[in-house]
Amino acid sequence: MPQLLVQAPPWVRGVFDHAWAPMQALTRQVSSLPDALCDYLMACEVGFLAICPGESRYQLGPGRIRDREVQNVAYVSVEDLAHDNERPLHVIGHLIDHHLGCGGDPKGPWLTDGGGATPGWQEAGGRLPGLFALGYGPDEIALSDVRNYFAQSLALYCRERQRLNVADPQIHKWFRSVLWNKGFWRAQERQRRKGSR
């Protein structure tokens, strides 16, 4: 966003020494996600990532960034990037949950709601409410609801895997065997191609 650092608090400008620095910080965080997931999200017709002043949040449905119509935006706070905390990946986790569940359809079920872009995703996502119900979420945010459980756990898997594994070994195993599993991604791509014929 133009003038992002000008709009940011002075302490943020002290962390970032040039206008592209927040984007570089976001790129570092996103680079911890699996390549197959990033490829999948890039292929979706909707879904957008933007750095903003204010709070990090996921906005479902239509929006506008500059003069561009967009849909399903993960707004990442420049302050969260300056703090180098897990909030950017948490918000991106909501975008991932939504798009793996229904490809970003505003009225479709998210992965954590029982949706799934393929039968394999639906089966994998169907396990998430049961894992959440066990009550082993790594922190209060993760324990608040199943969507936050997924998003916060994903952020911690990217940043503090050992902490997540100690707090909730089952969701750690889910991420390792599903989202970070190249074989699982290949199988989903085969299912998707088979379904489009």
Residue ranges and their predicted role:
Residues P2-D17, P22, C38-R197:
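Active-site-flanking segments in enzyme catalytic domains
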Residues V30, P34-L37:
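Generic structural signal for alpha-helix starts
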